[in-house]
A protein has these predicted regions:
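Hydrophobic transmembrane alpha-helices
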Residues: 6-24, 47-82, 88, 129-174, ...
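Juxtamembrane membrane-interface segments at transmembrane-helix boundaries in membrane proteins
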Residues: 1-10, 111-112
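Generic enzyme active-site microenvironment
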Residues: 39, 126, 209
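PAPS-dependent sulfotransferase catalytic domain
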Residues: 97-147, 158
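Transmembrane-helix signature of polytopic, lipid-linked glycan biosynthesis machinery
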Residues: 25-32
Length: 290
């Protein structure tokens, strides 16, 4: 029984890896042909859903079903947000490209067709697809322990994950409305007048941290990791790698974004000094000295 289940897990991992490799190669080829390097961005919110339901079909259990359902809610919401910003197009390989890839193409270390092509192959197309697979990997822990009953850890992980999905949705909606008002250039009936004067978002959840949507996204996948903890009984297991690498990616991404904003908006450096990046530590009450 144990050997049979191990073989099934190995087969599932093989399916994931083959699928991930095929998608990465496709993203590389399409992005090189079209010069639109946001092909992985289009699939970022969709691939975890695919991994989830493949796992659920092969290893049906209450835990895997709950995890797959939460990932589907997360993915559909994020896909909707990406779509309304112009990320998807009726022609699949078209759509809005993330402005940061254009900035990266102008970087002296990456400038040139060959250099950026290598960066596209190793980082944009392959590393990011590997990362998606890794932060989805708590599903493998749940699949390998499908007979383990649900615990209080599952309940807490599910409640907090759903909470952070809602927070991320609020943050994304606030930012989307801000950019709508900014693009319309209206002078009346504007919700984010203070932010519009500065040119960047400083209201709503942005009063507390500079990247509330990034904070929520990282916490979503940390919560997801705890389903694997509940299934395996191991507080530290291999699936933690995905959450850690995702956090590192967001740290690097936010630094790139903030560098661009600092050059573009004179007041951004002040905002950067006054408001925390991810954790609203500044708004916690200070400890009292005895």
């Amino acid at each position: 029984m144990i050997l049979g289940q191990l073989t099934e897990i190995q087969n599932l991992v093989s399916i994931w890896i083959v699928l991930m490799t095929a998608v990465a190669i496709l993203c590389f080829i399409v992005s090189e042909i079209t010069r639109n390097y946001s092909q992985v961005d289009k699939l970022w919110s969709l691939m975890p859903i695919v991994y989830s339901w493949i796992t659920s079909a092969i290893f049906p259990s209450s835990r895997v079903f709950i995890m797959s359902s939460l990932v589907t809610v997360w993915g559909l919401r994020l896909s909707y947000n990406f779509s309304r910003k112009g990320g998807y197009n009726i022609i699949p390989w078209k759509g809005e490209e993330d402005y940061r890839w254009k900035v990266m193409r102008e970087n002296s270390l990456l400038k040139g067709r060959l250099r950026f092509g290598l960066f596209n192959f190793f980082f944009i197309s392959f590393y990011q697809n590997i990362l998606i697979l890794l932060f989805s990997s708590p599903l493998l822990m749940a699949a390998g322990n499908q007979d383990k009953p649900l615990t209080i850890i599952d309940l807490l992980a599910g409640v907090f994950m759903l909470t952070f999905i809602i927070i991320e949705s609020i943050a994304d909606n606030q930012l989307f409305r801000f950019h709508q008002e900014k693009n319309r250039g209206e002078n009346e009936s504007r919700r984010y007048k203070k932010s519009l004067r500065k040119g960047f978002m400083t209201e709503g959840l942005w009063k507390y941290v500079r990247h509330p949507n990034f904070t929520a996204e990282q916490l979503i996948w940390i919560c997801f990791y705890f389903f694997g903890v509940a299934a395996s009984g191991q507080w530290i297991n291999f699936s933690l790698t995905g959450a850690i690498l995702l956090i590192l990616l967001f740290i690097g991404s936010s630094q790139l974004t903030e560098g661009i904003s600092s050059r573009k908006y004179p007041e951004y450096s002040i905002y950067r000094k006054e408001i925390p990046g991810f954790i609203p530590w500044k708004f916690f009450p200070p400890a009292k000295n005895e």
